[in-house]
Amino acid sequence: MSIQEDGLEPMLLAIGIDSFDTPLAGCTTHFTSILAYTLSIHGYRLADYPWLVRLNPAVPWKTRGNGATALLVSVDREDEARRVAEEVTSRLAKAYGSTGKESFVAILLYHADNLQDYITARPHCLVELYRRAVHELVPLKTAMNCLESIREDGKTKLIALHGSTHRGLVGALAALGADLITDHTFELIVYRKPRMWSEPRRIDEDSIIEFDLKTRPLTFLNYDYEQSKPLIAPHGFDPVLYGVRGEEPHILLKALKIIDVEEEPSHWTIFRTNQATNAHLQRKEIERVRPYDNAIVCGVIEDTKPIPGGHVIVRLCNNTCIDTAFYRETGRLRNHVLKLPRGTLVEVGGQVKPHTDKLTLNAEYLRILEPASLRAGGCTATIPSGRNVILYPPRAAFHHLMKPPERPLHPSKSLEPPSTPIHSDTISL
């Protein structure tokens, strides 16, 4: 943190945003992209790319992708922070229109100048809230308690709060506490003009494959070659034309020249994200899993039963038991588990859902283990080689947080300030 030439100590206004998605076209990232652009043309500097933070994919009331967002805005004075929060953000939120369940929160951090300052100075309750919100079900009261903690913290100040009684508050605060130090990725999202939102997307499939082949492994989940299916475009009525994900922002900009679309986009924005990091998964003993957890459990196959619809239920036991569902959409993952004999030791990661009087773990991946890996309640931290085989579903079955096996490891990845433009120069409506 440094003193500016005018003698003012710089500050950061952190804005957390959630629940601007609606069944008909509303989108939290779209609102955030417009807000980022609006702040830029008013002369405000963003201290980082906008954050796109995916939270617990198992919760029952999520909107598309269960994503919240955050912006870090450099300001010089508290009254300037209030203008950003109350005049720019609040007015834009009202003009954008939504279901009335949207939330945003603006927190001012004193003596903060850049991204690293923010990571160091942000209230600890935000970090803890994120860690819980990405793994498990978080009560609204937990978010309210975090707000009270921020109000009493002399290093920060709550500048604005909208939607404090809605569950979007959990996402808005959790986004501000996201752990993007351990691992992070980027997504370039290209948006559509409003008149096109109800029209089918026309994106040349060959150009998606070309982009994938030219940019891998720095980009990922562009195309499912097993099912001959593009993965970059949503299917509903919303403002997103397509999004490409990767390790570094500069590689994503190539999509603007390579991917061929039959419409003029409105604008684009690059987000820093926790996508494709497996941030949601947490190792647990079977007896400790709860509804809407995202858990990794270890156990022995007790029983395997195909059920109507092409799905398979595996009874997995280690002191206690849990049903593990391998749905038809998991393809070869389901096919392989059918061949495993009773007594096979496996590790399964996925989402815990309540079904009548018991819990079911919806499988995202399967690891076949050596019997020596089993210990009381779980598996050894270091898993032996040999039969240590990991199986995944087709890429089309991956959700936002699932880490594809082709993603390279980046143990030294650091939080660097923006190295490319954050968004397009204009928005064309």
Swiss-Prot record:
Entry annotated with the keyword ATP-binding: yes
Catalytic activity: cytidine(34) in tRNA(Ile2) + agmatine + ATP + H2O = 2-agmatinylcytidine(34) in tRNA(Ile2) + AMP + 2 phosphate + 2 H(+)
Localization terms from the record: Cytoplasm
Family according to the record: Belongs to the TiaS family.
Key words of the record: ATP-binding, Cytoplasm, Ligase, Nucleotide-binding, tRNA processing
EC numbers, comma separated: 6.3.4.22
One Pfam family this sequence matches: TiaS_TCKD
Keyword field contains Cell division: no
Enzyme class: ligase
Gene, per the UniProt record: tiaS
GO cellular component: cytoplasm
Annotated region (Disordered), positions in chain: 403-429
Top-rank taxon, per record: Archaea
Protein name, per record: tRNA(Ile2) 2-agmatinylcytidine synthetase TiaS
Role description: ATP-dependent agmatine transferase that catalyzes the formation of 2-agmatinylcytidine (agm2C) at the wobble position (C34) of tRNA(Ile2), converting the codon specificity from AUG to AUA.
Primary site of residence: cytoplasm
